[in-house]
Amino acid sequence: MNNRDYFPDLIGQHAVKKKLSFYLEAFHKTEMCPFLNLIGAKGLGKTEFAKAFAKNLINKDGDKRSFLELNCSTIKNNEQFFEQIFMPLVADNEITILFDECHALPLDLTMAFLTIFNTEKNSRKNFEWNEATFEFNFKKQTFIFATTESDKMFPPLKDRLTTIDFEPYSSEELGEIIKLCTPDVTFADGVIQEIAQTVRNNARSAVKRAKEINLYCGAKEKNTFDELDFIDLSDHVGILPFGISYTEKQILSTLKEGSCTLTGLSAKLGLSKTAVQRDHELYLLNKNLMEIDGKRKITSQGLELCKFFA
């Protein structure tokens, strides 16, 4: 195996890079690639890595393989997939298909995929449906799946795929992403680290922060960015410590007054219990700003943060 860097423009995810690089090397020798399943939280770069992986797949004639990205929530049933997607775009073509948010695949197509991807040594698979035969050629067609909710995937389908797990980014990696996305900006010492502390652990959040910095520098007609600039930007766009949202700030302020049940917290915030649990509590728990022990409670770190808001 050579040491070629197939992902020079992507930061972090070293285990993912090693695994995908191995499969690319194998593909270049065998023309075969396993059915990949990219799993991780929102914003960790699953789609970007899938696109970068696909760019490195070369057809027999030396051209880059075509790439098709599908959001599985838009696929309604077998009929739509085979008649509107597979036959005109996939059949007999050299192409890579990304099934994004694959936990949302319709049930009948999931059942079809159980048959289609139930193969080990063969490079072809014929699938019969609705009195027609559809040929899958796995030397021509590469299939990649991605999801943020692997627990909702049909287990037998998940077993047929090769899992690639993504992990949260470190503050240093988030800082590197911000610098990569702000090539015309020179940062004062220590500012990147301070900015990275306000990014919510994922690459997408870092890219958004970089866009805000680019807009700020463009509006100010400057190409340097220091601590005072970051304070000014934070004031204008509402950047809070740890990158928490104003709703999360409200949760901490509520819990500062005393522990609370989920129902009580939901009522005080005017949000559904599901919204509180899925959209706001998770990040506060991740940052150890609150805890759940029967009731919702603020931690000592959360109390320290509330002093900053006072």
Where are these regions (language model features)?
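C-terminal helical "lid" of AAA+/P-loop NTPase domains
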Residues: 193-197, 204-219, 252, 282
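Conserved AAA+ ATPase "SRH/arginine-finger" region at the nucleotide-binding site
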Residues: 148, 162-174
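Short glycine-rich substrate-engagement loop in P-loop NTPases that contacts/grips substrate
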Residues: 17-18, 64-93
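Pre-Walker A (pre-P-loop) alpha-helix and adjacent loop at the N terminus of AAA/AAA+ ATPase modules
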Residues: 2-39
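Conserved catalytic/switch belt of AAA+ P-loop NTPases
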Residues: 25, 107-138
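Walker A/P-loop
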Residues: 25-29, 33-69, 86-88
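Terminal-proximal interaction/regulatory segments of ATP-powered molecular machines
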Residues: 258-310
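The conserved phosphate-sensing helix
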Residues: 199-214, 226, 244-246, 259
